[in-house]
Amino acid sequence: MEKNLPKCWQTVKDCLENGIDRLILFGPPGTGKTFAGLHYGNVSAGAHRLVCTDDMTNADVTGTYIPSAGDWNWQYGKAIKAWEGDGVNGGRLVVDEIDKAGGDVFATLLSMLDSPESASWENPETGRVHRPRQGFSAVMTTNIEDMRELPDALIDRFPVRVRIDQPHPDALQRLSPDLRNVASRMCDAGDRRISLRAWITFDDLRASVGKERAAEILFGDRAESLIDAMTIDAI
């Protein structure tokens, strides 16, 4: 293992750098799951991100016509772009918050995340049949904790699931040294959790208004206890 790399991140690294092409990263928000999906492993053929929402449509996944200079041009969706990669090798598809995908979109994603031998999509306008190129991989992220909340069909396609319970060490380096331990602990503190983004904002703000005022602004009635925790860590 690399020095100072938490177990969850070492697992992600081992998977994506050694041929695991279907991976779910789950756990509290703000830990770097999306960043890992976009950058870990071989992404030389490109990485494409979808963020699932209730109003997302299949056009975001497969493509649609868009107006351009008085005409209509076909623009492929993120999944097809990931399938095609660089034209020789498939790229990476990162689907954020997969649990928020609507029914139609979810069904389309499932079909596109089937085995390479079975997955295909026909462009309804041109009749061209697309299939994932060799090397295509997919990473799903979700903030839910219980994988039983995800449909069985998705779980079947993604046998490897890693809970990310700590910020990546590289992300923690953005914080001043005195904040890194407490920020790492609070990332996975259940209902009391504080995101890494909030700590970064606090770090920036305290430089101008002082730590007490910055804590009051960012953390409200928890400010005093968090300042105490920072003080203890500094000892």
Model-derived regions, located:
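C-terminal regulatory/interaction module of P-loop NTP-utilizing enzymes
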Residues: M1-I235
